[in-house]
Structure formats: structure tokens, C-alpha cells
From Swiss-Prot:
<keyword id="KW-0678">Repressor</keyword>
<dbReference type="GO" id="GO:0005634">
    <property type="term" value="C:nucleus"/>
</dbReference>
<keyword id="KW-0238">DNA-binding</keyword>
<comment type="function">
    <text>Transcriptional repressor. MAD binds with MAX to form a sequence-specific DNA-binding protein complex which recognizes the core sequence 5'-CAC[GA]TG-3'. MAD thus antagonizes MYC transcriptional activity by competing for MAX.</text>
</comment>
<keyword id="KW-0539">Nucleus</keyword>
<feature type="domain" description="bHLH">
    <location>
        <begin position="55"/>
        <end position="107"/>
    </location>
</feature>
<feature type="region of interest" description="Disordered">
    <location>
        <begin position="176"/>
        <end position="202"/>
    </location>
</feature>
<comment type="subunit">
    <text>Efficient DNA binding requires dimerization with another bHLH protein. Binds DNA as a heterodimer with MAX.</text>
</comment>
<dbReference type="InterPro" id="IPR036638">
    <property type="entry name" value="HLH_DNA-bd_sf"/>
</dbReference>
<keyword id="KW-0805">Transcription regulation</keyword>
<feature type="short sequence motif" description="Nuclear localization signal">
    <location>
        <begin position="21"/>
        <end position="49"/>
    </location>
</feature>
<dbReference type="GO" id="GO:0046983">
    <property type="term" value="F:protein dimerization activity"/>
</dbReference>
<dbReference type="GO" id="GO:0000122">
    <property type="term" value="P:negative regulation of transcription by RNA polymerase II"/>
</dbReference>
<dbReference type="InterPro" id="IPR011598">
    <property type="entry name" value="bHLH_dom"/>
</dbReference>
<keyword id="KW-0804">Transcription</keyword>
<feature type="compositionally biased region" description="Polar residues">
    <location>
        <begin position="192"/>
        <end position="202"/>
    </location>
</feature>
<dbReference type="Pfam" id="PF00010">
    <property type="entry name" value="HLH"/>
</dbReference>
Length: 221
């Protein structure tokens, strides 16, 4: 009786272990077959471990190979981007990385200076824009003042032209009046001269007749 009871207890323990293992495998997402006994189970464990170790080792080797190939490709690209000088083929990986680091530092400094210059130019642009707007307002004001002054000047010029025309009319009238007066005076003088001459002629003719009457010899001649 004791032997069958021990066998039953062993089977119950194995069944319990199997159930616990199935629960753990269900939690992790995988399952395994129920071993027939502990020896077979141990053998399967050893085989699975050896297979896993060989698989992991080959996977690691493949990953390392890919990593080194990617690193070589990156170093070749880095040689193109970083200025190395005439002896670029003799540089080691360490010297290449050191030069790349210093080159990156220079690029960062240049980028900072460029950003500072851009900000300064933007400030100058805003200042010039404000000045341009101010000059535009000032120009508009000066144009309005200039147009007002030109209109006033044109009005004053028209007034001066009117005054000049009126003074010219007065001057021509005075000239006409003086010329008419001078012509009248000339006519008067000419008439007086003619009358004087006629008087003188009349008197001279009278004197001649008197002389002829006094001297009959002259008449006979």
C-alpha cells in the first residue's frame, strides 16, 4: 500500500508543477508540453538551454557584425563631412572623432554668430521701417505745405499782373494825353508862326508898294 501511495503523491506533485508552469507560461505568452517524468523533463531543459545559448550567440554575432558595418559606413560619411586635410587616409578612428568634435564646435559657434547677426539685422530693419514711415508722414506734410504756398504765390502773381495791367493802362492814357497836348501846342505854334510870317509878308508887301509909289523910276524899270 505504501508504494502505490508514494507513486500517487509523486504524480500529484508533478501535476501541480505542470499546472503552475502552465499558468506562468500563459502569463508570459508561451506554453510547453507536459513531460512524462522528471528525467525527460531535465533532458528537455538541457537541450533547450543549449539551443537557446547557441541561438543567442549566433544572434549576438550577427548583431555585432551589422553594428560594425554600420559604424564603418558612418566613419566613411564622417570623412566626407569633416575637413581632414591631405592625409585623410592616415587618420585613425580616434583622431577622426576628435576632429569631428572640434568641427561640430566650430559649426555651433558659427551658428550662434549667424543667429546674433540675424537678430541685429532684424532690429535694424524694424528701425529703418519706422524711419521710413516717419519720413513718409513728413513728406506728405511738406507736400501739402508746398502746394498751399504755390497756390498763394499764384494768387499773388495774378494780383501783381492785374496791377501791372492797370498801371500800363494809366501810363498809355497819360502818354496819349501828353502827345495830344504836344500836337495841339505844335499846331498852335505852327499857326502863330504862319500868322507871324503872313503878317511880316503883308507888311513887307505894303512897304514895297509904298516904295514903288515914292519912286516912279522903279516902276518904270
Amino acid at each position: 500500500m505504501a508504494a502505490p501511495v508514494c507513486v500517487n503523491i509523486q504524480m500529484l506533485l508533478e501535476a501541480a508543477e505542470y499546472l503552475e508552469r502552465r499558468e506562468r507560461e500563459a502569463e508570459h505568452g508561451y506554453a510547453s508540453m507536459l513531460p512524462y517524468n522528471s528525467k525527460e523533463r531535465d533532458g528537455l531543459k538541457r537541450k533547450s538551454k543549449s539551443k537557446k545559448s547557441s541561438n543567442s550567440r549566433s544572434t549576438h554575432n550577427e548583431m555585432e557584425k551589422n553594428r560594425r558595418a554600420h559604424l564603418r559606413l558612418c566613419l566613411e560619411k564622417l570623412k566626407i563631412l569633416v575637413p581632414l586635410g591631405p592625409e585623410s587616409n592616415r587618420h585613425t578612428t580616434l583622431s577622426l572623432l576628435t576632429r569631428a568634435k572640434s568641427h561640430i564646435k566650430k559649426l555651433e559657434d558659427c551658428d550662434k554668430r549667424s543667429l546674433h547677426q540675424i537678430e541685429q539685422l532684424q532690429r535694424e530693419q524694424r528701425h529703418l521701417k519706422r524711419q521710413l514711415e516717419k519720413f513718409g508722414v513728413e513728406r506728405t506734410r511738406m507736400d501739402s505745405i508746398g502746394s498751399a504756398m504755390s497756390s498763394e504765390r499764384s494768387d499773388s502773381d495774378r494780383e501783381e499782373i492785374d496791377v501791372d495791367v492797370e498801371s500800363t493802362d494809366y501810363l498809355t492814357a497819360d502818354l496819349d494825353w501828353s502827345s495830344s497836348s504836344s500836337s495841339v501846342s505844335d499846331l498852335d505854334e505852327r499857326g502863330s508862326m504862319q500868322s507871324i510870317c503872313s503878317d511880316e509878308g503883308y507888311s513887307s508887301s505894303g512897304l514895297k508898294r509904298i516904295e514903288l509909289q515914292d519912286n516912279p523910276k522903279i516902276t518904270a524899270l
